[in-house]
């Protein structure tokens, strides 16, 4: 296991934990699972997990991006990844993937992104933003219709989310910002026929 830091889009250094088998080559040939969360000030502390061993034994690298929105670097780190700074969370994660490619841990199209709940929001946003970076995405209970949820104050969790994501119903700035990244609102459906011209 190694801990490195990489530069994000704005020059901030972001921690990244990389776990791999000692026989796994760093020549760009390995598949890689990149985990991220980045919300509510929850830190993704490095820890042992026996469930990861099956992947690591198969030459799959496990990396955890300690992106803004968590509190790995304190309260300011959290604030730089919430409300109208939420896009820093997504940029940090995308730059983690780019760092792993540039440093030959993996290659473009060999990364599986993984996150759940608010980490599912992260997955939806980053796959919309940089689809070519990923082989696939694993979303566990994803929060992908974040704008519609935020607009419905009758839902039991919505009002409690205002401190993290903002209040889109009563604040146009928050509405516009959430709309700009909300996975559901930013999906495009492409269809084609066998001979589209």
Q: Predicted regions span which residues?
A:
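Active-site-proximal cap/loop segments of hydrolase catalytic domains
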Residues: 67-192
